[in-house]
Amino acid sequence: MTDKPGSAEDTIEMDDTCSPQFVQEVNRIKSQIKSLVEENHTRKFFRPLTSNIGDETAILRIQFNNMMSKMEEKEKQSLVKELIKMVHHVAEKNSPDRVFVGTNYERVVDQLLRYAHQKGAISTNLCAEGLIMTSDFRLCSRICQEKWKFINDCIPKIDYKGIRNILRYILESQLRRLPYSLSPEQVNEIRIVENVILHIVDRDSNLMPPLITLSEIMRGMPKQALMLPRLTEKLASLSVHFRPIADLSHVCGRGFVYPIPLHPSFYPLTSCWEEHGLNASNTIVQPHHTLPYRPEHTSTYLYTLYMILRQPLGKDSLHPPSKTKTKTNWEMLISVMICESMAEAESLPETEPIPRYQWDNIVNIVIYGITQHLLVPKTFFNVLKNLIKRCKYTRARDEVMWIVFQVVGSLSNLTRLDDAVTEIVELYNELFDGDVVWMGASDHPALFARFLAAAGTWMILEKDFADKMPPANETIKSHIKFIQDGVDNFDSSNTAMLAVLSNIYRTDTKMGKLIVPTLQQMLESIDDTKSLFELSYKRMAVNCFSAFPVEFMEALTFRSKKTLLIQCFQPLRSFSTVRLPSPAVFETVAKICESEDYEMAVKDMEHLAQRSLHVATAADRSSGEHQNVQAKDQCYFLFDFLVYRLPHLHAYSKYSSTVNALSYFTQHIPNNPQNHQIYRLMEQFLMRRWCWAGFHGCITAHTQMFGTSYKDNTMMRHMAYPKTFSVPDQYPFAINPEIFKMAIYSFLRAVKITAQDIAIEKTMFPTIINGFGWPEKSTSYFPKWALDAIKASDTSNAVNTEEILSDVRNTARMHTSLTPNQFVIRYGEDRDPATSHCMLAVLFHFAYNSVDSTYNITSEFYEVMEKKTPKEIVVMGNYLVDYIIADAKTQDCNEKTFKNIAKAAALLVFQFQVLRADRLLLSLIMHPATDEDALICIQIANEFILTPEFQERIRWYHQNVPKKDHFPTEYIKAIVKYHDAFPEFEACELVRSYDSSSNVHMPTYYGCLIERLLPIMDQYLHVALEQQGYKLNPQILQSVSMLYKFHAMPIHFMYSVLFTSHGLMSGPDAKSFVLAFATQIEECHLTEAFEKFNHQKSSREQLIMELIDRMSASLDFILTPPPFVAKDWKIAELSPGAQTLYLACIELMASPHSPETLVAAMINVMQMKPHARPFNIVNLTALLLTALPAAYSNALHDEFVAVFVNGETANLKFEEIVFDNYEESLLLNLPNRARTINVISQQYWLHCSLSLLNFFSHEYVPRILEHVKTEKDLWYTLRLVMPYLRRYYENWDTAKQMRSQRENFGPLHIVKLVFQKLGSMAEEGVEIVYEQHLCDLFYNCKYFFAGDFLRNTAITEFAKLPEKMRDRLKFYVSQSEPTAEQETPPEKEKSPEKEKEQEQEQHVKAHQPLESTPSVSSLPQMQHHLQQAPLLPSHQMMPPPQQHSSSLQHHLQHHTSTHQMMDTSQHQTIQQQSNHPTQQQLQHQIPNMSMHQQMGPQYPGAVFHHPSGPVGHVPMQYGMGHHMQQHPHLPHHQQMPAPMHTMNPMMQNMTPQQQYLYMQQLQQHQQHQQYMQQQQQHHHQHQQQPH
């Protein structure tokens, strides 16, 4: 039964843009087709005999053509799609009758389409697409061979976008419909289709860029295409052909590349290092797109992520707090880490305990992953179970269950566990599937807790998910019973059972309510019979030093530690001034903070300290003289703990804590002894926050506060005026300028070391640089913007030395003429700017003048000092330094003078105690603004350090005070003894009338003078080296180095000193410097070759190999780190890999060997012997080079250039240069030095900072290309350059700059240089052998990032290339998209019926390149077409009329006179009109539109196919076709037609000549009407023009 016309299945469904008339017309034509096929009486009677229905479509063809001629392009496409749907709808009915009917539908629709194409109503492209889609690829009916021959003939006449769409239709839409088994007859039948595909994909056909062909093939080829043997073979060879370009676009050995967390070039806060799949594409993870490549390059780089993740502290690099976190392959990676650790534990002797270094790291990673929603427990436990199932381990099963117990017991409120219960039970069954020997010891809490972790997990799951838990086995039951017995017989002295119960029972349970007071009691327990312990300066605290053993702390889960931390806060809040919190409380908090991430512990402690600071300052304002001493005590001991006990954290520089500390300094601080001490402590807090962070942390801290995102608030306005600190005005500077200046030095050193680009526009950086004076020698490593800011600084506020000397001497004389009371009134409350800050200078004047005699200070001086605020004390110290400099310049500056000055200063500091030693040294180091003043102050500081008083304190501290990380109890007791031996008094204590019954000293647990000196000594050594020619007095070096036994970041310090002074400090001095500090630093393990033999005993290659082996060992260990790294990662300065990297760099920078010889040795290492993991050595070598100063990378660049100079590329094959087979050649013992240089250079640029890519593109690549002489040289350069173009472009800020600077920036500049070099090589006659690969490479660049930015350069340079290569590149120089102002009609379409005429036309063009004359036979069609075209109002056809010029009037007169001869000499007229195309016409065309363009996405960076220009054109016209001819006299903007969607539909399918003729007639009609209205007599003869 057939469906009636107009039934529901035939009703067209169009979008809102289609008019009702259009829908009606489409339904009508469909009904006519259906009527023609379904109700044909001939078929009814003669179907068994024939399928020929005769030529009954003639009328329908004419109707169809007329209808199509009136449609816009979009409507034509919609109509063709509807016809295709109708054919497929009928053909899909599988009855024999319907198959026959479907075949007739296909024939009718095909005839309609071909007739419309023949008459010019539809484009060749649309016709071919429709014919393809009407074919029945289910093979229920036969494939029309003649139709597919027609399609094959049409292909060369279609632009490449249309050909791409045709290929898409065949592959994605039609071949997928083929059955999976074909008979030989069917294979023979579709061979014509195979021929069409082969014709399209054949590289020699050059129908479209081969890269687009490959893209379509790889994206859309169905499995059915593999049944066609010739096609399969062709596609395989096509993919193989692109292998060189695919390899070239990746770094050699990319699958084995990994960074080291905390590396100077490893900047985690940018998207550049985020692993693929963690929110942003990583620049190291370069997208392969459509290029074929190895399997390891088509998936996430798990090895890179694995190597980052398994390093302690590495996880923090992957997910900065500011980034949104998404999960990725963490489940698999952590499961592998666990299984590796279990396997390693199996190899240990049975009696040897399992090292917990890496297990603690794994637990930390798991907790972090789940809290940040990077791990899904269900997936994680399932993956882990499946891995453990394959290999039975027995040693570390308790450690695995401890991880499970941590998740179940601590993180149930942060993640879903209900769907992971089954996986947990199955994981337990896999771990303990047989007879198990259980071992647990109550005298070892950590092992005991892990022994019962499985039972604890079961108890919690049974309570929370009773309906999902299976019955426990006998082992679990016995353990649960054992735990319940511990509950029934609770014994608080059994710490092991206490830890287990604390882990299992929450605080809201009955047992939990017993555990909390027990832990609180242990915190408050007393060690000896004495209940109180005397801290420094007779402050009393609870006498308890170790509340919980270390093993007990390791037996607690994350939740239990958090509970214990909250309990520790209780005594920190509730205490009295005579009974302060015990040291045990602080040590417990310290252990928890060290074992957990910042967000889990330290953050809470910082918030508590910040609140106490606000309370203390509020108490000052509210209570006046009756200040809240308890609030100040709490504030002081909390910051004392944060500053001195936790000096270095890897999440240290927090914006909020720094801002809160700065806010404290902007307030008015009352003058009392307690506030003086808090002020000094807060200065240390800021100093360490700013200066003791890692390099990237330091940069982040400063850019957050002063960078582009700085907040224009009151505090920032304070910070913008550093010179107002001593002279208050509208915005008084908040903090000691010397501290802030020291922070800027640290910031700029970090910028130098990391080579980061700092955005300066709309930041405060130039302002704060401008506010200080900078000795020139100390600015050697400053970036250009900082030097420019210094040059622009205002020097009008320079110190007036004469005025200072006069004021001090006058004040000294006034002392003798005033009574003590008058002196105190005169100078203690004086606000005269000339004399209010000079008192320390006056005291120094007296002390210096009596340096050889005994001088005692009188009480009135202390009374004056007592009346000074903390800020005034700072200003007085700077004033003292100004006076010392001014006074020293009046004398003979010799060694004796400096010793006397230092002796007088020591008298003020250590005997009179009117000034602190650290404040004096800070002013001496940071206050001078010129090199002359800085050198004087450094020499004074040198002598001050060598004074007996200073030396005595250093030696005592070094000999008697242990490291607080390892011996906290002994440290606190030693600090008390130190203050007993060397007390520091407040000014009020030294006044005669002081009441000794009140103790003004704040409770000090950890701080002292030596601790305060540590960050200052860092800057002292930098300045001393800079001002003294990078030489240090050995005695000073020995004295200062003793302090670094207690330094929190000694390796960072040594590295930064050697980096900024590289090339300035001699080899012996550098070695002495390093060894002096290394002997004091516990974790500084240098090689024996350096310490004993100064790198002179072994060869340089052996030295490099030893350093690389150490780095590899510190990165590849599984359970226990090597002996030359820190033993505990939780309190280490650096992770193991970063520690060995920094120490290796320190050795190399202090080595007597030059950078050139060391870099040559790094290259030679790869030639020495076969390496088991060659790319690992290359990667570590690149990591070394990126962490070393620029001299080493310059040496590598020189080696690269030397390859060209020495002609080494001539010995390399093309395959050796391009392909990533370097590892294979090394494993076959076939090393090549030139290839090694290239591979190391690739990985160097991969690891380097993004900011160096500017140097790479504008300086390095041009330098290399200057030496390129041969094709192999060019390929050798491209092997280095190509992998980094995408890395450069994917940085968003860089991409924005590229869009603004276009071809003069970044990767476009590099590609432009390559084009120019290739053009110059072609002019010099250099033979290009692998031209196809070069063309493919250029297309790859065009479509992936270059676009049309380089089109003009390409036109110029490609014109110099051989003809064959130009032809392959013709698509590159075609215009991708016409601009809005320069849109033009579509290019001339071709049809099979006009093939001969077009061949003649092409022949004429070849011999007359400046003419484009249509054939005579086409003129009648054109004339007929024009006569049928309806006239539309001018506003629908033309753009808004422009102002007419005299030339236009002349043209109109000329045209009207010429038009009279149109009927008799139309051919000549058209020829005249098309003689001279303009330049704009040559550069802008519009492609044929196809129905696929509204059905699918366009190819990235797609361009349109235009035939190359005829031979003989100038180079700038290379590759451009002349598809539109215009009158030579008409201005271009007057001739451009309206956009396609506003044009007359008839014009869309005309040739350019027809369009132009039609447009001329419309213009004449419009002008004719105007002339009629104006009644111009000389136009009367043209009133009856035919249209």
Swiss-Prot record:
Biased composition (Polar residues): 1410-1426, 1463-1484
Localization (cell): Nucleus
GO cellular component, as recorded: mediator complex; transcription regulator complex
Biological process annotations from GO: defense response to Gram-positive bacterium; positive regulation of gene expression; regulation of protein catabolic process; regulation of transcription by RNA polymerase II
Renumbered residue ranges of the record's region Acidic: 1387-1404
Pfam family, any one: Med23
Quaternary organization: Component of the Mediator complex. Interacts with let-19/mdt-13.
Name of the protein in its database record: Mediator of RNA polymerase II transcription subunit 23
This protein's encoding gene: sur-2
